[in-house]
């Protein structure tokens, strides 16, 4: 690596918080599993992370992975605290005053599959919060002909591959790098980066064989020390400050909180203030359950009770009255002297998240404050009006409220990572309310955009079905089959569309009759488009008087319809319809310049 990423001054730095992001099945949990040296993944259904967790990886374990004991003194951070969760979910949950709490992120991409929806979502969120991250181009062991070298640094294993295999890896790697450029990130293979502030490092690796994992750890530690020194400084004497990651019911404990402590110290018996939808919760810590090093928060049997924890750490808190606590909300230690001030601060932070809503718009529900913020941000970016935005599952009350909205564009419920209550589901099945649920934010945005387009097309279709459209036709020579009552003539459609029951006019503006019928090859038809030659019955016209062979006639579009055609659905008309309408309007406006304006 060309750029030196070490520091020499000892600082009181806390453990950096690292969020692992990426698409399902691209190897997030396997990567962490390799770093930890435990076998968590193998015990999970489908090898997909099922629960949010946090794992502390001490610096000694990391140095051991790097294989160079001398590095111990070069790295000042005490280790890395990994948050492990599907996609980007924990990243948005881990929030502090609307910002991201994670110090660093890893975006895992399957080098063979490339970018997927949650990959793009992760990048968008990281860009928004300006979080430093490293990209792991995972599953290099699946490149055709790859000779795996267990746990080797990337440079060493790369040298052992044949030129053909090296070429295949470079091709796939630069497809990943190219897509990062498309997303607005300058990127390069990590060992070719000369300035990590300007260029994103991409580490080819295999979470299964361990190849490249030492490099991932090295880059993370280097980034933490080079760019996050100020963020990581803390004082153990400070009262604890953290974020609620998840609210969980536990046997024998009731409601508990999984918390990421990012500043100060939290002790058993401390008074804590926690955000809720109502007034902040004030309670005393009954028990602190901390995972042993290299064990997951989500494996309860591996907890040990501790008397205190110091940032940064993942800890489970047992305390009375936690039922109303919100995932993503702040938790702060308070003393008798500071209680009033802390309650006001926590309430203020929750109030900041209350979304500005209007009298019209969609309803949004999300599972945490952070994901609600992220979801609302994306919809507001697309200028979608929001009537209501709340944390929680979709309830019967939500369903009833949405059903009272008449506009189909806003009779909509959007749910991120939430359930639909059974009574709400029953009600919704009988209603016209549209419901979108997903665990990918931008899929919700895309699905809603698609729905809006469908509704607009449906509305246009209804208009098209009722609107008399422009049409132009010519009476063909030698094709007068009947002179009057009604006149029956052969015509060629020159533009637009001709339909039965439409009035027709000459180029001088005179209305000469109404189309009573159309026939093609002896069959009655309702309409005929440009280029068609058909027989037309015109009631009210007599050939030789009002009309004659080779006359060009137009559908006499009513003024109200002409306004809609010109001002509302003009872009939806075909080219020949537009040309025909333009000529028709010119003819009409010769005598009345303001006609249909």
Swiss-Prot record:
Region described as G1: spans on this chain: 22-29
GO biological process terms, semicolon-separated: translational initiation
Region (G2): 47-51
Region named G5: 206-208
Residue ranges of every copy of the tr-type G domain listed in the record: 13-229
PROSITE patterns with a match to the protein in the record: G_TR_2, IF2
Record has GTP-binding as a keyword: yes
Record keywords: GTP-binding, Initiation factor, Nucleotide-binding, Protein biosynthesis
Residues reported to bind GTP: 22-29, 84-88, 138-141
A cellular component annotation (GO) from this entry: cytoplasm
Entry GO MF terms: GTP binding; GTPase activity; translation initiation factor activity
Protein's UniProt keywords contain GTP-binding: yes
Region annotation (G3) ranges: 84-87
Source species, domain of life: Archaea
Annotated spans, G4: 138-141
Function: Function in general translation initiation by promoting the binding of the formylmethionine-tRNA to ribosomes. Seems to function along with eIF-2.
Family of this protein: Belongs to the TRAFAC class translation factor GTPase superfamily. Classic translation factor GTPase family. IF-2 subfamily.
Protein name: Probable translation initiation factor IF-2
């Amino acid at each position: 690596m060309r750029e030196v990423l070490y520091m020499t001054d000892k600082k009181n730095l806390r453990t950096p918080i690292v969020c692992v992001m990426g698409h399902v099945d691209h190897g997030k949990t396997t990567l962490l599993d390799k770093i930890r040296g435990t076998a968590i993944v193998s015990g999970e259904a489908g090898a997909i992370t099922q629960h949010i967790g946090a794992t502390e990886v001490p610096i000694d374990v990391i140095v051991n992975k790097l294989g160079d004991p001398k590095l111990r003194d070069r790295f000042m951070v005490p280790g890395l605290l990994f948050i492990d969760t599907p996609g980007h979910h924990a990243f948005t949950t881990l929030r502090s005053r609307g910002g991201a709490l994670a110090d660093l992120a890893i975006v895992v991409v399957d080098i063979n599959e490339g970018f997927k929806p949650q990959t793009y979502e992760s990048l968008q969120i990281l860009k928004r919060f300006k979080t430093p991250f490293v990209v792991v181009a995972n599953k290099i062991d699946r490149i055709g002909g790859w000779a795996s070298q267990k746990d080797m640094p990337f440079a060493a294993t790369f040298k052992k591959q044949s030129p053909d295999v090296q070429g295949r890896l470079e091709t796939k790697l630069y497809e990943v790098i190219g897509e990062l450029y498309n997303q607005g990130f300058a990127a390069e293979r990590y060992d070719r980066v000369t300035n990590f502030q300007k260029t994103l490092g991409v580490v080819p690796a295999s979470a299964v064989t361990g190849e490249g994992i030492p490099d991932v750890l090295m880059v993370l530690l280097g980034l933490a020390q080079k760019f996050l020194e100020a963020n990581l400084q803390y004082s153990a004497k400070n009262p604890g400050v953290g974020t609620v990651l998840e609210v969980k019911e536990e046997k024998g404990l009731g409601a508990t909180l999984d918390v990421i402590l990012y500043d100060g110290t939290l002790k058993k018996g401390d008074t804590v203030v926690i955000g809720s939808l109502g007034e902040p919760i004030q309670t005393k810590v009954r028990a602190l359950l901390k995972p042993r090093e290299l064990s997951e928060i989500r494996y309860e049997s591996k907890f040990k009770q501790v008397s205190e924890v110091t940032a940064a750490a993942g800890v489970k808190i047992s305390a009375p009255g936690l039922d109303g606590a919100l995932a993503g909300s702040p938790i702060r230690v308070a003393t008798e002297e500071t209680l009033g001030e802390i309650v006001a601060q926590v309430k203020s932070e929750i109030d900041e998240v209350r979304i500005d809503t209007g009298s019209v718009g969609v309803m949004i529900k999300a599972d945490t404050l952070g994901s609600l913020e992220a979801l609302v941000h994306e919809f507001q970016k697309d200028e979608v009006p929001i009537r209501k935005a709340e944390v929680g599952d979709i309830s019967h009350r939500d369903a009833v409220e949405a059903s009272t909205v008449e506009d189909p564009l806003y009779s909509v419920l959007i749910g991120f990572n939430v359930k639909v209550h059974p009574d709400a589901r029953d009600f919704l099945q009988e209603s016209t309310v549209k419901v979108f649920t997903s665990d990918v934010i931008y899929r919700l945005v895309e699905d809603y955009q698609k729905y809006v387009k469908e509704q607009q097309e449906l509305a246009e279709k209804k208009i098209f079905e009722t609107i008399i459209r422009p049409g132009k036709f010519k009476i063909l020579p030698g094709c007068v089959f009947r002179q009057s009552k009604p006149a029956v003539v052969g015509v060629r459609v020159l533009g637009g569309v001709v339909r039965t029951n439409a009035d027709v006019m000459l180029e001088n503006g005179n209305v000469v009759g109404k189309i009573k019928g159309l026939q093609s090859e002896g069959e009655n038809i309702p309409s005929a488009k440009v280029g068609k030659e058909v027989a037309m019955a015109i009631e009210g016209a007599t050939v030789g008087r009002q009309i004659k062979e080779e006359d060009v006639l137009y559908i006499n579009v009513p003024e109200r319809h002409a306004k809609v055609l010109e001002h509302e659905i003009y872009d939806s008309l075909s080219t020949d319809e537009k040309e025909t309408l333009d000529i028709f309007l010119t003819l009409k406006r010769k005598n009345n310049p303001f006609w249909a304006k």
